[in-house]
Amino acid sequence: VNRHKFLARGAAVSTAAALLLGVAGMAMADQNHGDQDVDVNVGITEVVDGGVLAMSVAGTATALTEDGSTPAVRQFKGTLPTVTVTDTRSPDEIPAGAGWYVLGTSTDFVGGAGQPAISASHLGWAPRVIDGGGSGQVTEGDRVDTSMDSGSNAVGLVDQELLALTQDSGAIASEGQWTANADLFLRTPATVAPGNYVAKLTLSLFE
C-alpha cells in the first residue's frame, strides 16, 4: 500500500471540506438582496481545414515472453498494441483511387549487457484486423515468418511489412475508424546469449 498516496488524498479532502465550510459561513452572515442570471454563449465554427487521416497506437511498449521453445529454437511471444486508423475526411477530400496502408519495421534487438544483437529478421508477426468496418474493405497483411523458418515470407520485420490496408479510402471514409493488431514472435537459436534485449518497431501510415 502506498502510504504517501493515502496521506496526500486525505489532505486534499480536508482542504476541500475547509473551503466548503468557509463558503457556508459567509452565506449565513450576509443577506441575499436578489439574484441575476447571466447567459453564457459560445459560437463554434465549422472546421474549414477539412478532415485528416491519422493513426494512433494503444501503448508505447510490449513485452515478449518465452512460449513454445524447442531444444533447437527458443521462441518468445507477445502482442502488438492495438493500432487505430481514423479518417475524418469527406469523400471529396480524398484523391480518386487512393488507399491507405500501415507498415511495420523493426530494428535489431540490442542486448542490455553487451550481448550480440539479435537481427530483426528473427522477429515475425501475424497481423489481425480487429474492426475492419461494416464494408469489410480493410484487410490484414500476410503473416511474416522469421529467418529461422522457411518459405518466401521468412524474412522477419526487417523492411516495411504490411499490417493492414484498404484499396479505396474514399469508399470507406464514412466508417471513420478501424483497428488492427498482430501476434508477435521472436525465434532464435538455442545458443542465444541470455539477458534483456530491446528493439524498436516503427509503424507507419501511408496513402
Language-model features: where?
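Signature of Gram-negative chaperone-usher
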Residues: N2-G10, L19-E207
